[in-house]
Design a protein with these regions (language model features):
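A short, well-structured edge-of-sheet supersecondary motif
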Residues: 1-2, 150
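Catalytic-loop motifs flanking and including active-site residues across diverse enzymes
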Residues: 19-24, 76-79, 126-130
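Active-site-proximal helix/loop microenvironment
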Residues: 12, 18, 103-159
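Active-site SXXK
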Residues: 14-40, 71, 133-137
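Conserved catalytic neighborhood of penicillin-recognizing serine enzymes
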Residues: 34-92, 139, 143, 155-180
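Short, glycine-/Ser/Thr-/acidic-enriched flexible segments
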Residues: 1, 29-31, 76-78, 123, ...
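A short, polar/charged loop-to-alpha-helix boundary motif
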Residues: 2-14
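Short, charged, amphipathic alpha-helices and their helix-cap/turn boundaries
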Residues: 88-105
Length: 180
């Protein structure tokens, strides 16, 4: 819907932790860099001079060695950044753009693991892009075109159906998500 000129479906915005499964875990799981049982150190990635440990987790603590499964379930910032750095922020960027069809990411995003790891993108991503990515995970790794709903001036809903499916290679990620 459009609210005061802002289209919540098509305008890019910052999604933060909601992008971790898509920007960090999906690419690394998909190519075998990590598995659900891989151990990741839940410990600050670096000490920012004058600011302390970075990143911090929402619960303000650290678990030490933990599995990808736990890191994803607990939305651990430290682990997301570590996975993104080991996979590579440029590779994560390419995965999101080439496999998932994200169009609002910038080259600057591809150079910053903190941004890619925690969802603080240069411009942001759209609700349409996020919905399509999560739908592919839920659909065993197959992405369908977006089916927007339009409302005509007389109030009738018009569904624009997309045709065909494109495999995006999320079968491993989809299987992991089904375990939840």
């Amino acid at each position: 819907t459009v609210d005061r000129g802002w289209n919540w479906a098509t305008e890019p915005r910052q999604w933060g932790s909601a992008t971790k499964p898509i920007s960090d875990y999906a690419p690394a799981l998909d190519d075998g860099t990590i598995t659900a049982a891989s151990a990741i150190d839940d410990y600050p990635v670096r000490d920012l001079s004058g600011y302390g440990a970075w990143p911090k987790n929402s619960h303000s603590g650290f678990y030490g060695l933990t599995t990808v499964w736990t890191a994803l379930g607990e939305s651990l910032n430290t682990c997301a950044v570590r996975v993104n750095e080991s996979y590579g922020s440029a590779a994560s960027y390419n995965y999101m753009v080439e496999k998932m069809g994200f169009t609002t990411l910038t080259q600057r995003d591809s150079q910053q693991s903190g941004n890619m790891g925690l969802g603080g993108y240069d411009v942001g991503v759209t609700t349409e892009e996020m919905a399509a990515a999560y739908a592919a995970i839920a659909n065993d790794g197959y992405a369908r075109g977006i089916r927007p709903v339009h409302t005509s001036a007389d109030g009738d809903s018009i569904f624009v159906m997309a045709s065909g499916e494109v495999e995006v290679g999320f079968d491993t990620v989809a299987a992991l998500a089904c375990e939840c």
